[in-house]
């Protein structure tokens, strides 16, 4: 089974009004993958095609049960893009770390610092990411989304190391 850590960047928090602007993915043995496109439908089609080509996979996120997966579903519905049912194909590292309890504190950056992985963001914060997309600064956008995917990957590996997976 291919394990893929991923992260979405969006223009806001509402999947009915806001859109996905970047998807970053990291897996063992593969190069990092970043999908971004001004046309959200094309981006979603590329994402689902990538997963389909992976065959047997597990999609690993951070807070994805409450955010990323919802965005993927709602935005794909909007654009009539064929999806893969992710119900039994995902792992949410935040839920796993909290043993299934939906404790709302603890950001990805905090978990990363906790396990000793400190990414380099070039000073960007999540709230500034839509500006990178708006100003077509795709290099910084790609770097940001892949750093989040890497943080998720390292957290997932630590959860396996300590026996929570």
Predicted regions, residues:
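Conserved RNase H-like, two-metal-ion catalytic cores of nucleic-acid enzymes
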Residues: 1-53
């Amino acid at each position: 089974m291919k394990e893929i850590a991923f992260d979405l960047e969006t223009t806001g928090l509402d999947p009915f009004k806001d859109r996905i602007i970047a998807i970053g993915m990291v897996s063992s043995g593969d190069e990092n993958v970043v999908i971004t496109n001004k046309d959200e439908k094309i981006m979603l089609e590329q994402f689902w095609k990538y997963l389909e080509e992976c065959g047997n996979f597990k999609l690993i996120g951070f807070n994805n049960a409450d955010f990323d997966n919802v965005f993927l579903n709602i935005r794909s519905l909007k654009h009539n893009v064929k999806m893969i049912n992710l119900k039994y194909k995902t792992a949410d590292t935040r839920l796993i770390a909290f043993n299934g309890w939906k404790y709302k504190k603890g950001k990805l950056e905090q978990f990363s610092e906790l396990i000793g992985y400190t990414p380099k963001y070039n000073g960007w914060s999540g709230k500034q990411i839509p500006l990178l997309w708006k100003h077509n600064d795709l290099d910084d956008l790609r770097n940001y989304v892949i750093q989040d995917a890497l943080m998720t990957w390292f957290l997932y590996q630590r959860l396996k190391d300590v026996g929570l997976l």
